[in-house]
Amino acid sequence: HREGDDLDRLATWCSDADRAVDIATGAGHTAEAILGAGVDRVVAADAAPEMVATAVASAPGVEGAVADAERLPFTEDSVDAAACRIAAHHFPDPAAFVAEVARVVEPGGTFAFEDNVAPDDDRLDEFLNTVERRRDPTHVRSHTVTDWLTWLENAGFTIETTDVITKSLDYEEWLGNVDASAERRRRVAAAFEDPPDGAAEAFSVTTGDDGVESFANRKLLVRATR
């Protein structure tokens, strides 16, 4: 998640802010990009203290906060931009997360959001989420575009921009990113060997002599205002 046009877009959407928070910052790439876009104060927030430390160390000028995405330690209307990039599929209660963002972003402020999304077809949705959980047990769920837009609107956000992009993933690199064990790799491969009808086409699966070589997933980008 270190770079890409999608990262640049999220940072640009936040660029008019004076104080921004990057929620579930991970290694801090998004927080660093927002700081680079000209925002004076950027807080890198994550539930894992070691991730906050990494983010602050890698981006001088970024502040750190250990924070649960669904219980943010900020007062109401205390930031004028919030971002969350490719992390929300780990959250147990996404509606509560969106409501928390709405609480801390001031009226007129921006929420720049990106996450993996599932197809509307229930079988393909279940296939994608099964594969993701077998790869990474911390994966909770990739939701649909409709789910996310509904949660945002219910929390009082106005949807300004939406875009769904498709990213091709190298299969071995994708597994290696989470240091998947041999057993997890076996279970992921088993799912790809017995997919529901239409999955190979929906996820642009390519195979070779040794099995899956690549597949694609979709990501939703949203710019919303409070």
Task: Describe the residue ranges of each PLM region.
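A short glycine-rich, Lys/Arg-flanked "PGG" loop and its adjoining helix->strand segment in the class I
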Residues: 95-110
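Conserved class I S-adenosyl-L-methionine
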Residues: 112-134
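Short alpha-helix
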Residues: 140-156
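A conserved beta-strand element that flanks and buttresses the S-adenosyl-L-methionine
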Residues: 83
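Conserved Class I S-adenosyl-L-methionine
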Residues: 155, 159-226
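Class I SAM-dependent methyltransferase SAM/SAH-binding core
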Residues: 21-71
